[in-house]
Design a protein with these regions (language model features):
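Active-site environment of divalent metal-dependent phosphoester hydrolases
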Residues: 59-61, 109-112, 154-157, 177, ...
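Conserved nucleotide-state-sensing and coupling region of NTP-binding domains
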Residues: 221
Length: 242
């Protein structure tokens, strides 16, 4: 009996940290937002508004993802990997035309924290140049500079660098780990169970399972009364309350 109890205790101790990583409680996200206020995790509001962000764009799935977003009267911030942008200018044009927006996700799909400062700065600058070209082609100004680090990890040096470059670092508060988990239904249920006013959803382009996930998530959020917004729209909506 004592052995069984010990094994159960060990199992609980092993499972709890993984569960907290998979579904961090609101209190933990609130702590992160206080601890690193220069990083955007969520916004504080009682309004039924929620931010949608799409990482690892553009890809062969971008046009369908954007179509689903548009069908649900939603907007999103697409975080772009610079090495994927050449040859997908039409996707970028369509994103901007639709009222969604472009953000910076560095040049390659790798952990930004592992890069030397000079290389990261160069990559952010190069992706920024490409984003500016996309906006200029549409005769529209860049309204904001958002950077999301590859793999989602950052340190104090990166925060200082990003701030010096005039960028707002963005993480989020609802992440279904869809970059690794291919079950669209599981990912959709994760998002819907974590959605709350002011949340920022992180999901990924370049994965075919994102499409059915969004087909389930976006109509359900609308049914619950949420407006689904880009980061700029989300921040502006909160500013009107002040």
């Amino acid at each position: 009996m004592a052995t069984l109890l010990a094994l159960l205790t060990l199992a609980v101790l092993l499972v709890i940290p993984f569960y907290i990583i998979y579904k961090p409680p609101a209190s933990l996200i609130d702590y992160f937002a206080r601890r690193w206020p220069d990083v955007l995790w969520q916004v504080s509001t009682d309004k039924k508004i929620i931010g949608l962000t799409i990482d690892d764009a553009p890809s062969q799935h971008t046009s369908e993802i954007l179509r689903i977003i548009n069908e649900n009267d939603a907007h999103a911030t697409f975080f772009l990997i610079g090495s994927q942008m050449n040859g997908r200018e039409e996707d970028l044009d369509d994103i901007i035309k639709s009222g969604s927006e472009l953000g910076n996700h560095a040049m390659h799909d790798e952990a930004s924290r592992s890069l030397p400062d000079g290389q990261l700065e160069s990559e952010i600058f190069e992706v920024n140049r490409k984003i500016k070209v996309a906006y200029e082609y549409q005769n529209k100004p860049m309204v904001a500079n958002y950077f999301r680090p590859g793999s989602g990890f950052f340190n104090d040096k990166m925060r200082r660098l990003v701030d010096k470059m005039g960028y707002r670092m963005v993480l989020g508060s609802v992440y279904p780990h869809d970059a690794q988990i291919s079950s669209w239904r599981m990912n959709a249920n994760h998002i819907l169970s974590m959605a709350r006013p002011g949340a920022i959803i992180i999901c990924h382009d370049r994965r075919s399972w994102t499409i059915p996930m969004l087909r389930m998530v976006l109509p359900e959020l609308k049914r619950r009364g949420y407006s689904i917004m880009s980061l700029t729209e989300l921040l502006k909506e909160v500013d009107t309350d002040k």
